[in-house]
Amino acid sequence: MEFPLDPLLTPIEARVLGALMEKQLTTPDAYPLTLNSLLLACNQKTSREPVSHYESGEVQRCINELQERKLVEVDWGARAARYDQRLTRVVSLDKAAQALLCVMMLRGPQTLSELLTRTQRMFDFGSTQAIEEKLQHLCVKTHPAFMHIPRLAGQREDRYMHLLSGAPDLEALAAQTHNRSERNDDGRTQLEERVTLLENQLAELQAQVARLLEKSAE
């Protein structure tokens, strides 16, 4: 399959696939995810822009549609079905590209410094220069999955975003920036990352307990 996807991803599809990709890289022992774990991952209060409030039924319907598109695969366990994303295999993305795509799907357009901070638990780029070189390569493909957004009014840096949900409305992005002050990466972002780390550790422990219960039931 080539980019762009046909049809493009809806907001909930992007959130579901992004959450699956994130947990696959950050908490592999808790992956694939059950419906409940996936719902919690989609509706996290941290590392999500915007924060969502999806219901279980909405996520289940989305999963069913993604299964039909071969973008999600179900793993039938002893106690509950678990869901595995297939997007990165369908479109042949390596781990570095998966980490970048994951953050953009969950948090929208990102600066290089934001990507460096927010991908560090998924892939060790080491520097913003390494990320920039990777994105430059990805942005010049015949059917690119990523796009470079020059610095807009009210912004200090260029940004990058994914194109799996379509091309951006640059006027809307500029308006969002005008109505919301820039985040301080050395403060709030680092706090969010620490909270997310604790959430992921809790999810991993819960998954380990669930797997032990599955084994005891066999």
Curated annotation (Swiss-Prot):
Pfam families: DUF480
InterPro entries associated with the record: DUF480, WH-like_DNA-bd_sf, WH_DNA-bd_sf
SUPFAM superfamilies: Winged helix' DNA-binding domain
Family: Belongs to the UPF0502 family.
Name this protein carries in UniProt: UPF0502 protein CJA_1529
Protein's organism: Cellvibrio japonicus (strain Ueda107)
Lineage, highest ranks first: Bacteria, Pseudomonadati, Pseudomonadota, Gammaproteobacteria, Cellvibrionales
